[in-house]
Structures are given as structure tokens and as C-alpha cells.
């Protein structure tokens, strides 16, 4: 489909500044993860400065994991400023479907900000797209609808690239469909790996124009690094350390060699 490794090379060469408005559980892990990738993280939340900060960045990542109205107000300000500056916005609707407030907040952000990439698990994306699914906490529930159809529906609804992550990752712009099958189950045993992935999607989107292709490349790289880390660590604590190292050490050539990608 593409030379996905070249995107990693570009990220490491350009070290894009990624403005993260993420949750308090994962802030340190996300910042260190982006540094390991080769990007530059900034975490800024105050509504008084987010518009100025986002104009310095190459991507904006919005994550509602620890949700409150103050942060939502700041996210909307930052998102609109990013739209004005043609900076890609990545939205991670953590826990959408778990509560009415969380689901409606996700939909509000999608109404008021033009999102470039919507990244979530199956139940989060299904809930936002109007599919009926019960969610246990913020983990993926059982989605009856075909996930590809759910992803395409969401892509058309919100006019963006949709990434549904799971054992196999689905990427679509509403027309093209790509499946990325890299990764390791140990990712589910360390909190923040999904949130970091959303920020890595931002780093890759920040160095090119085609967010569909950049998303596929980011997913392949992230999954290959996870597979590499899993060969060195068999428990969550050591895996977290090994994964950060693998993000730093994985080469563009390894991504091209081990990426498992199907689709256009």
C-alpha cells in the first residue's frame, strides 16, 4: 500500500510539536512516549493560553479521559484555533457510551471542532455514531454491528478519518478501508497505551497532508514496537519500560518489514 516507514523517518527528522490536552492519568507516559518516538510534547490546558500554544504546534490531541467542564471549554477554544490555523486535530473520546455526560461531551466537541482523526475503541466509536452498545467502564464493549460499517458511518458523520483500535485496527475515511494487524495483547495491561497512540497519530499527522496514510503508518509503527517489546517483557511493569525503549529503537526499516496491512 505504502512505504509506512518513511513517515517515522519524517517524524524523527522534523520532531513535530504535539499539543496534548490529555487526561491526568496518562500525562507523564504520553509525554515520555512522544519523546521516545522522536516528537516534541507540550501539555497546556489553561483556556487563557491554549489558542496561542496550539498555533505553535503541528498537531492538537484532545482526550476526555478525566472529564470536567473547565477542560472541555479549553479544548473547544484550542480546537477552533487549530481549525483556523489548519492544524490537524485528533480526538480520543475516552469512555464515550459509559455515561450520558461523557457521550454528549464527545458529540459536542465533534459538532464544534473539525476533527481530522477520531480514534477510539469499538464501543466508544459506536456510541458516538448512534449504535446501541453498553460499555463497561472505558473498555470496549460488545458491538453487534459490523465494525467496518460503524467506522465508515462515523467517518461520514464527522467528515474525518476514523480509527477503531482493537486486535485488528480499522482505518477509514469513509471510502477507503485499511486493516492494520500489528500489536500485542500486553498493550491492554498498561494504562495510557491507547492515549499515547492518539498522540502518536498526532505526531504522524503533523508531518504530512494525508491523515489516512499517516494514521496507517502510525498504527503499524506502534504495533511493531509493541511486538518488539513483548519479546523482551512478559509482565506489565517491565513491558511499559520495554515499550518506551522499543518506540525509540524501532527503525523505519523494521516497520516496513513487519507491518501487517490489508486494504487500499
Swiss-Prot record:
InterPro entries, alphabetized: Hyethyz_kinase, Ribokinase-like
Protein's recorded name: Hydroxyethylthiazole kinase
Gene it is expressed from: thiM
Involved pathway(s): Cofactor biosynthesis; thiamine diphosphate biosynthesis; 4-methyl-5-(2-phosphoethyl)-thiazole from 5-(2-hydroxyethyl)-4-methylthiazole: step 1/1
Entry keyword annotation includes Lipid metabolism: no
Documented EC number(s): 2.7.1.50
Cofactor(s) this protein requires: Mg(2+)
Function statement: Catalyzes the phosphorylation of the hydroxyl group of 4-methyl-5-beta-hydroxyethylthiazole (THZ).
Signal peptide: none
